[in-house]
Amino acid sequence: MNDKETDKEADTMEGFDRGEDIAVMEPLQVSDGSPHQGALTELAVDLAAKSAGFRRSLPDSVVNALADLVRAMNCYYSNLIEGHDTHPVDIERAMQNDYSDNPRKRDLQLEARAHVTVQKWIDEDGLAGRAATLEGICEIHKRFGELLPDELLRVQDPQTGERIRVEPGTLRRRDVIVGDHLAVSPGAVPRFLGRFEQVFSRLGKAQTIASAAAAHHRLLWIHPFLDGNGRVARLMSYAMLRDALDTGGIWSIARGLARQEAQYKRQLIACDQPRRGDLDGRGSRSEAALAEFTRFFLQTCIRARAPTSL
């Protein structure tokens, strides 16, 4: 799976809980009273209108063909974000069971096939209504991981050199540090995912569109799996927006995120930061940073809604 910045082990004691309060993850949404809310609502409405118009403008036969293209495109760009440059031709060959004799290239082809397969399952309503649930998030990870070669299910402890196997669909039992972010302790992960599900799985369509960016970041912030969190977050976001916007699977945000990768990652890091004083919301994390990421995310969706080529 290999997120581009490999998850780093911070402690080998498995399953411990530091007792973190779920309040340290707040806010989970940009508040109604935020000075940013008006502009974000306008972007969400614009996205909904343009997505619906684009979907209605195409006959079903074109929608089906375009959905196949988007799955390959989404896979290609999601791979780029992970640091895996799998050529579109190799992705197409993988879908035809035509694999390279080069072991590394073959592994990346299998990874690409896994991504396309899981997204097709989402497009066929396999995750309908469950994208932001603990069950759904674990199922994305499980379905993806079970299709990967063993080599891509291994992460290395930078302190001991130990090669640790990632168990598909299983929440991590170890501490991890990604960049400067120490994720919540492994014993706290179910508690934080419970709060995540409580907030994001019960939203109406309009609220889902407006909150998809926040869900994307907060899942990465929790970092529920030993590896593969970036892919799961992008597939979850794809599924949430597909349900809320009835996209027909004909556009995806992954291309836009990959083309602005540096900004995407800067925005995610900014959302990790604590509140910047009394005018920055009422939660532990910066509401202004979350609002800025939401703006970036929605604008990226608007630009990405009409894919024509890789």
Language-model-derived ranges and their functions:
Residues 1-310:
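FIC/Doc superfamily catalytic core
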